Amino acid sequence: MKLKVGVQLFSVMTELANDYLKTLENVAKAGYKYVEYVDVPGNSPEEIGNKVKELGLTAIASHVHFDPFTSTQEDMVKIVEDNVKMHSEAIILPMGIMTTMEEIKTVAAACNEMAALAKAHGMAFYYHNHCQEFYQVEGKTAYEWLVELTDPELVFFEVDTFWATRGGQKAVELIKKLGSRAKLIHQKDMGKSADPINLIEGVTDLTRENYCEKIFGRTNPTDICTVGTGIMDIPEIVKTVTELDYAPYIIVELDSCARQTEEEYNTPLSPLASIKASREYLESVIG
């Protein structure tokens, strides 16, 4: 199965906040047919869903405001119902902060519950990693515990290869280990400024209160760059995902990147130009 290139709309967050529907048009003009939602206040689910259909886009999934520690059953039902109206194929928990076994169990239980609800409405459920999940808790990483404690028939994983790398993992090995549960791939590229690459190494006494300072406080916007202009071995990732044949999409996500050009590091592209260049690069690698 040939990989399809999608885009996480967080990559154009400022544009979305200014005019969500116009930005969808511009994303389509940038050559994208597959999009992944990010939750932005403003337009109704119906308006967004109708626009996506009008443009002939496929809504791969949606990163949602779902907190495993505070979201109620009512909150979860609304999330699912809104995403049905948006024609989303899946719901994704963008990140979880788990630094103790009790917290891991809470996140796992919430994922199982949301996944069952999503399935009942014809949608899949995924967990998207950053790097803090690769902190060790009782002999394993929190991520390993999450994989073990979630229902393999309901909970799948969107592997963010950049953040996995910054968690001290080899992205291709993580994808291989997850096997058929790794059904979506997030791809950005790593700038030369990323130092240290492994943000977890040496971190101790991590908590839900201090994780942002201890981990993300050591990052820089230029750590993330346009796909194909950084130091990640993206052809190896594409080759691995293609050979395994579990994930139909590789999704560009550029976070708050400086979007450097290959020719002149630190010269930013606009977000729309950057996602276009990223798509073109990935499609050239996929062939």
Language model features with spans:
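Acidic-and-aromatic substrate-binding clefts and catalytic sites of carbohydrate-active enzymes
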Residues: 13-18, 34-47, 65-74, 97-105, ...
